Each structure stands twice: as C-alpha cells, then as structure tokens.
Amino acid sequence: MSAESFNISAIRENKLLARREVLVEVSHHKAPTPTRKDLREWVAKQLGVDVSSVFIRKIKTEYGIGKSVAEVHVYSDSKMARIIEPLYILARNLGEEGKKLLEEVKKKRSERREKKRKRKK
C-alpha cells in the first residue's frame, strides 16, 4: 500500500439497516487497484470497527487515471450484515469462508430442485 492513498469522501448513516454507507476515494498512481482485503482493513481501522462488519460493495476504477471510488457498508453487527448483504457480496468479502458459504447454498438449492423434480414425476 505504499503508492496508495485512501480518503473517506462521504459517510451516510442508514439507521433502518443499522449501517453506515461510506464512499472511499483511492489514489493509486502507477499501482494496481487496491484489493478488497486492504480496503476493508483500512476502513475498519479508520472507523474503529471490526473488519468482519465491513463489506466492500463495489470498487470503480477510472481508466488511466489511477483513481478508484469504493462503496463500503459498515454494519454495527456482523450478524446483521449476513442477513442484509447479498450472498455474492459476502462471498467476495469473506474469502475462503465466503466460498464455503456459497457452495453450501448452491448445494441446498440443488437438493431442493431434485426434491421438486421427484414430486413432479
């Protein structure tokens, strides 16, 4: 993260969903777009929260400029995040744990489909 500089440009409180919606501007000249992991750790450190309650929704990089804007959701409780955030966002942010969660859900879905097919016959 030596050539990268992070800056929180906006914070919006969403009391209904018990989260803060944060916009982070990242300047990364002559460097690749920062990873979700690096961004999550930086936001958690800046806001004084646990990394498990920070979820990167999207990172939009402008071509050739070396500037990215990230949309981040910071929850008051990580359990609430697992209920609200879509499965693909959880999988992207949680790494190996997210992949296991995704596989588990896919397996359950396929089992339900099989049961439904058997009932039709």
Curated annotation (Swiss-Prot):
InterPro entries, sorted: eRP_eS24_sf, Ribosomal_eS24, Ribosomal_uL23/eL15/eS24_sf
Keyword rRNA-binding: no
Gene3D superfamilies given in the database record: 3.30.70.3370
Superkingdom, taxonomy of origin: Archaea
Gene Ontology cellular component annotations, sorted alphabetically: ribonucleoprotein complex; ribosome
GO molecular function, one term: structural constituent of ribosome
Gene Ontology biological process terms in this record: translation
Alphabetical UniProt keywords: Ribonucleoprotein, Ribosomal protein
Pfam families according to UniProt: Ribosomal_S24e
Keyword Ribosomal protein: yes
Family from the record: Belongs to the eukaryotic ribosomal protein eS24 family.
Record-given protein name: Small ribosomal subunit protein eS24
Biological source species: Pyrobaculum arsenaticum (strain DSM 13514 / JCM 11321 / PZ6)
Lineage of the species this protein comes from: Archaea, Thermoproteota, Thermoprotei, Thermoproteales, Thermoproteaceae
